[in-house]
């Protein structure tokens, strides 16, 4: 079986290799996967990021698994409309915001996990609740803010369980 292509989409003001992506990369490595993190810092428009991601993954080997935080969560879900994606793991995704082109998501995989903080003052948790309800996603709401910095160990556990669906490891 071909190894999955695992991609991290960072948020608007973030960099590719912050605390969350480093933690998820380590968990992915333990599962035998490599997490790649494209650099979107030169692209302010989220839909430019979507276009870039879709173009870069057109010929990706194996199943494609997209992960992302905030704007990166939106980018991952929006790109899934145009790609054959096996799974989405989204942290505080920026859904249903003004200025973002896509508000109706389709062609999404069955395996979707969404993590959001109750105290998020940047992206309202209601968007994650709405999205998760519409797409039957696993939803985890944690006592944390937008960055989810206090919840990285919990997110790591959730990500490990999420990846088990693709690696067969338990």
Task: Place the predicted regions along the sequence by residue.
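Active-site catalytic motif of lipid deacylating hydrolases and related acyltransferases
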Residues: 2-61
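Conserved alpha/beta-hydrolase "acid-adjacent" motif
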Residues: 17, 121-127
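Conserved alpha/beta-hydrolase fold motif
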Residues: 65-66, 88
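Gly/Ala-rich beta-loop-alpha elbow adjacent to hydrolase catalytic centers
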Residues: 67-77
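Short beta-strand/loop motif that positions the catalytic acidic residue
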Residues: 108-109, 113-116, 120
